[in-house]
């Protein structure tokens, strides 16, 4: 609208895709070719229910596709894959080609409320399932990628972690 290089970004979870306001927002963004990036963290649970109990499929990118929005489905536990997808879709939005949508597929390690590893209303996940996802820890995977692909020495990660913790506090 203002013809500036800015791109609006909205982060939300898979359960929000079941709300009308999300579809209204995507429809408006697509119709007006707004420079917008929708980022959905699909952790496979909405509040207390597995996605398979709420939807006919486990991917939510189909909702954006219905609004003619460019979509990318990525491994949400791969920080670099998410960053690469965001860079592509932001560049597209800045060119005036309309909004983009990232579905970052990940997993919620803990319950919706509190620190219980199980879902809060009696749904129990197997220990094996949770353990498999924990092996895909995005921070540990990023450290491996940065050391093998970007040449960052493993000894530097302690300093990086400390700086990040200071920023977060």
Regions found by a protein language model. Give the residues of each.
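Glycine-rich ThDP/TPP pyrophosphate-binding loop and its adjacent helix/strand module
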Residues: 1-168
